[in-house]
């Protein structure tokens, strides 16, 4: 009985895999990931706050109950930061429990917000919509915009099943693949512009590809402004992108053209980046070879980036990002040691300076020395030891560079057993005898 009691709730074993998946979510783009300690802190804090739920298993239903209760709490001024961290960590755990794999904490919070919007929409308008549109049930799990039988439209958040399906396709085939484009084009037919852009932003994918997609969207917006001067019946870029609109406003019939234009812009951007990815000389495919110096790699990379038909800010972003991600493992480690946490934001010149010696004989000797350097207790033991030859700390007498004194002839550089004068007979050939004494205190 004592053995069973000791295992009760210890470490939340039912959430072992969930916590493991949560530890892969990053705090922000390019930042560190959540740790197991973060997850356990959140779970134990929740158990402490809501003692009535402590004995219940950690199912997704319990998590939603806790989420709703946390929304109703008002933290003190000194605890607002910890409270926000608690909510963010819980959102990540909930996403992992549902099988989703958001890249960042912000993406996880966005997913839960979308689910939350769906739930609130169902509770507030479910009965009314069902009465006006009896055949709604077979459509409601896919389409955010629904035409009501009595006229008008109703908006609901993107269903998590659809979001998860898109996420799976993006992970398996790539964010700019034809498979993902087809899936997004199909579902986005009845999405608002805000839905399309939010879902696209939360998809897993290469950061450089996402930046290129955003650059293509900006180009489409600039082209629209040039070809469509402002007027009373002309859509603005903000209307097309869903800026400054509520979801209910964006779902109405007068925004159909704006939604379709936004959808087409996104599809065009995906195709453009995909064609760039498959074209010879694509910067994202330029990677440092094992025998190539970092300077030669940077020369090839910058040449490929400068040849791309993208804006200068996009080129700068690609140079800063790919100069690290596409470098060899040795160069990445050297940049991490030299530049630290700012390695992702460092300029190309700083990275070249950090990697100037990578591959040289001196660098290889340095790596070998680091590999052979004693570690742990053995490495710290010699620090407090004292040499009995010269009296200085930090090394032993057998390691002393000042040499040793022969107690037969009194000369330095050899021991008494190796003394040449010892083999000669006669006391007259023998030097003055040296009496051993304590080393001088230096």
Swiss-Prot record:
<dbReference type="InterPro" id="IPR001878">
    <property type="entry name" value="Znf_CCHC"/>
</dbReference>
<feature type="region of interest" description="Disordered">
    <location>
        <begin position="420"/>
        <end position="442"/>
    </location>
</feature>
<feature type="short sequence motif" description="PTAP/PSAP motif">
    <location>
        <begin position="436"/>
        <end position="439"/>
    </location>
</feature>
<keyword id="KW-1187">Viral budding via the host ESCRT complexes</keyword>
<keyword id="KW-0945">Host-virus interaction</keyword>
<keyword id="KW-0677">Repeat</keyword>
<dbReference type="Pfam" id="PF19317">
    <property type="entry name" value="Gag_p24_C"/>
</dbReference>
<keyword id="KW-0863">Zinc-finger</keyword>
<dbReference type="InterPro" id="IPR008919">
    <property type="entry name" value="Retrov_capsid_N"/>
</dbReference>
<dbReference type="InterPro" id="IPR045345">
    <property type="entry name" value="Gag_p24_C"/>
</dbReference>
<keyword id="KW-0167">Capsid protein</keyword>
<feature type="zinc finger region" description="CCHC-type 2">
    <location>
        <begin position="404"/>
        <end position="421"/>
    </location>
</feature>
<keyword id="KW-0479">Metal-binding</keyword>
<dbReference type="GO" id="GO:0039702">
    <property type="term" value="P:viral budding via host ESCRT complex"/>
</dbReference>
<dbReference type="Pfam" id="PF00098">
    <property type="entry name" value="zf-CCHC"/>
</dbReference>
<dbReference type="InterPro" id="IPR050195">
    <property type="entry name" value="Primate_lentivir_Gag_pol-like"/>
</dbReference>
<dbReference type="InterPro" id="IPR036875">
    <property type="entry name" value="Znf_CCHC_sf"/>
</dbReference>
<dbReference type="GO" id="GO:0003676">
    <property type="term" value="F:nucleic acid binding"/>
</dbReference>
<comment type="similarity">
    <text>Belongs to the Ovine/caprine lentivirus group gag polyprotein family.</text>
</comment>
<dbReference type="GO" id="GO:0019028">
    <property type="term" value="C:viral capsid"/>
</dbReference>
<dbReference type="InterPro" id="IPR008916">
    <property type="entry name" value="Retrov_capsid_C"/>
</dbReference>
<keyword id="KW-1188">Viral release from host cell</keyword>
<keyword id="KW-1198">Viral budding</keyword>
<keyword id="KW-0862">Zinc</keyword>
<protein>
    <recommendedName>
        <fullName>Gag polyprotein</fullName>
    </recommendedName>
</protein>
<dbReference type="GO" id="GO:0008270">
    <property type="term" value="F:zinc ion binding"/>
</dbReference>
<feature type="site" description="Cleavage; by viral protease">
    <location>
        <begin position="363"/>
        <end position="364"/>
    </location>
</feature>
<dbReference type="GO" id="GO:0075523">
    <property type="term" value="P:viral translational frameshifting"/>
</dbReference>
<dbReference type="Pfam" id="PF00607">
    <property type="entry name" value="Gag_p24"/>
</dbReference>
<feature type="zinc finger region" description="CCHC-type 1">
    <location>
        <begin position="385"/>
        <end position="402"/>
    </location>
</feature>
<keyword id="KW-0946">Virion</keyword>
């Amino acid at each position: 009985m004592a053995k069973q009691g000791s295992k009760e709730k210890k470490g939340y074993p039912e959430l072992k895999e969930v916590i493991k998946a949560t530890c892969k979510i990053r705090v922000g783009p390019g930042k560190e990931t959540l740790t197991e300690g973060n997850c356990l802190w959140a779970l134990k804090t929740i158990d402490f706050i809501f003692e009535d739920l402590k004995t219940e298993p950690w199912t997704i239903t319990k998590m939603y109950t806790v989420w709703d209760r946390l929304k109703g709490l008002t933290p003190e001024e000194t605890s607002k930061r910890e409270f926000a961290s608690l909510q963010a960590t819980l959102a990540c755990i909930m996403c992992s429990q549902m099988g989703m794999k958001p890249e960042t904490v912000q993406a996880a919070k966005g997913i839960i917000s979308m689910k939350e919007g769906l739930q609130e929409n169902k509770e507030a308008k479910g009965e009314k919509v069902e009465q006006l549109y009896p055949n709604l049930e077979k459509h409601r799990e896919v389409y955010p915009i629904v035409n009501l039988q009595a006229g008008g439209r109703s908006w609901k958040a993107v269903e998590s099943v659809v979001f998860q399906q898109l996420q799976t396709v993006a992970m398996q085939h790539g964010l700019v693949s034809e498979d993902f484009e087809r899936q997004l084009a199909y579902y986005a037919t009845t999405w608002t512009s805000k839905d399309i852009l939010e879902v696209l932003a939360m998809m897993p994918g290469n950061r450089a590809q996402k930046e290129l997609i955003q650059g293509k969207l900006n180009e489409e917006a600039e082209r629209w402004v040039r070809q469509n001067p402002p007027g009373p019946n002309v859509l603005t870029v903000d209307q097309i992108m869903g800026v400054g609109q509520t979801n209910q406003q964006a779902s109405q019939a007068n925004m159909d053209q704006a939604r379709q234009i936004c959808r087409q812009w996104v599809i065009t951007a995906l195709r453009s980046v995909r064609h760039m990815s498959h074209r010879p000389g694509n910067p994202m495919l330029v990677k440092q070879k094992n025998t190539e110096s970092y300077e030669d790699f940077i020369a090839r990379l910058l040449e490929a980036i400068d040849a791309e038909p993208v804006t200068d800010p996009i080129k700068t972003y690609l140079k800063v990002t790919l100069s690290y991600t596409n470098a060899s493992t040795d160069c990445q480690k050297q940049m991490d040691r030299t530049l630290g946490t700012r390695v992702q934001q460092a300029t190309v010149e700083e990275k070249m300076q950090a990697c100037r010696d990578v591959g040289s004989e001196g660098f290889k000797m340095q790596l070998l020395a680091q590999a052979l350097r004693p570690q742990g207790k053995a490495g710290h033991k010699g620090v407090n030891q004292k040499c009995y030859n010269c009296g200085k700390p930090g090394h032993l007498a057998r390691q002393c560079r000042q040499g040793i004194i022969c107690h037969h002839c009194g000369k330095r550089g050899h021991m008494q057993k190796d003394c040449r004068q010892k083999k000669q007979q006669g006391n007259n050939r023998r030097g003055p005898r040296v009496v051993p004494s304590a080393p001088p205190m230096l």
